[in-house]
Each structure stands twice: as structure tokens, then as C-alpha cells.
Amino acid sequence: MSGLQPPRGTHDLIGETMRRHHHVVETARRVLRTYGFEEWSTPIFEDTRVFSRTLGETSDVVSKEMYTFEDRGGESITLRPEGTAAICRALVTNGLTQSLPQKVFYHGSMFRYERPQKGRYRQFHQIGAELIGAESPLRDAETIAMAQDILRELGLGDHVTLELNTLGDLASRQAWREALVAYFRDHADALSEESRVRLEANPLRILDSKSEQDRKLLDAAPAFADYLNDDSRQFWDGLRSSLQAFGVDFVENPRIVRGLDYYSHTAFEFVTSKLGAQGTVLAGGRYEGLVEQMGGPAIPAIGWAGGIERLAMLLDSVPELPAGIALVPMGDEAVLKAASIARVLRSAGLRAEIETRGNMKKRMERVVKSGASHAIVLGDEEIAKNIVQLRDLSSREQQEVPVADLARILSAGRA
């Protein structure tokens, strides 16, 4: 193939791919608004500290995957690798920390330097939601139920499973972390090289390891459930009972963890077996220190993000564009009249195109091939009477219609 190609790990959104993308976003937007969420948009790039502070200097995202550069003013800038940190930054920047709760959703491009594979790109798109100022397990459950409603509206309810875990509070995690570190140190020789590095920097990330030798050790590692204090158990019980009240089914998975201290209590993933190893299509959890890291007060929140590409790949079908209406003018004066009619039809929300190439036969062949529902034919005789010939391309019926009635007739029932 000749010519310039898009960079590795990126792709063009055109045709059906774009329609699928748009359908995911519009479906999610519709559901999110029924829950009272408002759309925000943040810059596609931020001060690098927005992400290095929140994701952790030792995380894979910060150390290996971020697109970071120095701009001409000498500032370190990073293309956003995820959306939550920027939303929390925007909350603080715009003085909204005293106006809680804030129900926010967003969508857009994210960037990570990863190995491209099915459903995973270096420029990818996410849609996410954050309920900032959420203190109860009921709000966590409601936010998860909202995500499930989106998946159901997309027709994916039967293709995904909700996996759920508790991360407890900070005191519970510290007790568990100490037990884990002691266990891993006792078995350090059996850890993979990467996990030995993580043992010193962030031992909880060993739990995310895909290494077979690490997985064997993890099977016998201290169980977090044994280290939950009373407050954490109460929150965990409240979350599960609230999910049941919302009618949300789930499977408990103790291996769902988050490696940063500001995550707490709720962690969840919606997973599918239809995308191979990259089975997570939407994931989230509760966090309690992220706003504080942006210079605001300590505010609890619950949020999630879903990969639009992965969700789009799972769709069985996507709504087609509405059939258009083709105007077929014959003669220079008719072309100008067709332009005027097209403007009126478009103002009424109808899709209208003007066909001017070739003779009448060629024009009608192209109109039929385009999938238009109706053809509007006009020439000098029709202009003189201020009418058009309206042809239904399915039934092949044709009728004379006054120009003034066209938009009403087509809007009411496609004639």
C-alpha cells in the first residue's frame, strides 16, 4: 500500500467503525444523563505532574507508557493516559470542591505506548464517569448499576460478567501489605525478575503479574479477607447488599486489586471472554486521596472508565444511518430550486442530497444505489407550478406534491 500510513497503534475512525464508536458514546451519554451526570471536557494534554503524582512514579504507565515531551516553553507535558486525574484536577482548578457531589462523565482520546493488539491501541478512546463526593456504599452500587445499564443498552448484557472485590480501608490494606511483603520476601527467589523490582517499589503490583511463576506463589499468598477490619467489612457488606437491591449480579474476585494507596474499598471490572486475553471492557473503583493530590481537600469518589474500541467490537450490530432523500433537478433553474428545497428539508432534520451528474437515467441509478428512500424530481414544468414529483423508491409510487408540503409529508411518514 502506497502513501503515508497512520502511526503504529493508531487507526482511522471511518464508515462503520465510526458509526459503532458514535453509537457507544451516544448510548452511554443517554444513560448517564438519566442518572444526573453532566459532561465535562478537559485538555488532551496536561502538566506531567497531573499523572505522575496520581499514577505513581513506579507505575508501568508513568515509567514506560506515557507520551511525555518538553514544550517550547520548557514545560513537561503529557498526553493524557487516562481521564480520572484530569477530572480531579479540573474540579480543583474550577473551585468546585465545596459544591458536592459532582456527577461527571467524559469521553475522548487517551494515549499509552503499549504493544498494539486486539482491542488495544496507543491512541485509544474511553468513556468514563466520576461521582465525586460519594461517601456511601449505596453510591458505589448505583455507579456500578449505571455502568451495567449502559452495557445492557448496548446489547452486551449477556456478554459480560461483573467481577467485584474490596480493597478495604487504608488500615486494612497496610496490615495486608505487611503480610504480603513478608510472604514475598520469604519467596523472593521464586519471583519473576519484574516482580522482584516491584517488591521494593510497589509490592501490591505483584498481584497484577501475568507471569506463571508468580501466579503459583499468589495462590498461597495471604488473603485480604483475613485482614479486613470492622469498618471495611461493614462497607463491603453494604456494597453487596446495595448491588442486590439494584438487581446487579456479580462474582467476587479477590485478585482485582489497585496498586495505589488512594484506592479503597470498591474495585470492579466488567469482563468478557469474546476479546481473548484483553477481556476487561469497563473497570473502576473507589478512591479517596486523588483530589487531595491535586491540591484540594480529601474527597471520596467512585468512578469507572470503559474502552470504546473494545465495546464497539462487541456490538452485534449498529444502527444504520437514516435513509436519505435525493433531489434530482433537471436544468440550471431547477438546480437552484433544489438547493432551496434541500435547505428546508435539512432544517426539518431530514437528510437531503442533490444529484446533478449525468443524464436523468444516470442520476436515478446513482440515487437508487445510494439507498435513498425518496427521490424528488423537478424541472421547468414543476418550478412553474411550484410542485415536485415525489417518488417512493421502495414502492416506486410517484405523486405530485406542493413544495410547501414536502417537509411535513416526508417527516410524518416518508410519504
Swiss-Prot record:
GO molecular function: ATP binding; histidine-tRNA ligase activity
Keywords assigned by UniProt, alphabetized: Aminoacyl-tRNA synthetase, ATP-binding, Cytoplasm, Ligase, Nucleotide-binding, Protein biosynthesis
UniProt subcellular location: Cytoplasm
Record EC number: 6.1.1.21
Main location: cytoplasm
UniProt catalytic activity: tRNA(His) + L-histidine + ATP = L-histidyl-tRNA(His) + AMP + diphosphate + H(+)
Pfam family, one: tRNA-synt_His
GO BP field: histidyl-tRNA aminoacylation
One Gene Ontology cellular component: cytoplasm
Similarity comment text for this entry: Belongs to the class-II aminoacyl-tRNA synthetase family.
Subunit structure: Homodimer.
HAMAP family xrefs: His_tRNA_synth (MF_00127)
Protein's name according to its UniProt entry: Histidine--tRNA ligase
The encoding gene: hisS
